């Protein structure tokens, strides 16, 4: 029933707000890594994928940087962990895109995304989790997809990602937990690539790969929090995790080497929600970034007694929480996995604040 439910769910992900629904791709983890992402070619036009990859490469990575790092990235493939390098080679074969370019793009996504994530608990103890995924490149709207990962013949977990990307920034393990990831660091791209390579050589893992492994392996919310807190990463990140029981919500602020802060829900003292953007929650954001403030004002106005999935969606749809760079919005609850909903935000949000 769960397998069918997830497929129906993700195929009809606009049932609450029926617009801009991404396609769904089923990935069979029982296949060899090289074969897993072959279903991409049944959903996406390969020529369109190649064109989109070219646009991203030319805008994300300056030509001189691509020429400098391309050969180096290829030589570093032996340091990329299983099964991701094999999956990347499989994608390269089906799309006829240089595997080094796909690897570069997979790493570039790690430190160029801006997001808002919210976890909230109502007075009955139900947990709601929502996120906006923001990115400067509109072409990603054409690459956005929902993914259902099957293992041992059953739907194991699901998420939202981009064609050609093997990690997850948004995901759900049904009846266990949901998780989203937000970029933390704001270094220049060149420095990030240098640090990324250094971390790779030191056994650091991309944050989105750790998320995917956690979705696949963690037994419950507590186990997920431990798994997301410990491993060395290639970049700093915020992990926002929500469970199925009252109090199971937390923001994990990660350095490359470990946790910098753990910020749990605390409804007994008024902390019934947590809003995380791309700044440490104990620091003021940039004056030009009002996402956190706007979300908190809206949540306080709604109140814990009235929060639900629809109200959370309304908060995420407000400007400037949603802006012209917002690629997609996801709403999810691990206790009610059929409510997993992703909407592509066509052309972003331009409405005034209310």
PLM features: residue spans?
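Loop-centered beta-sheet repeat module
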Residues: 180-182, 188-228, 235-237
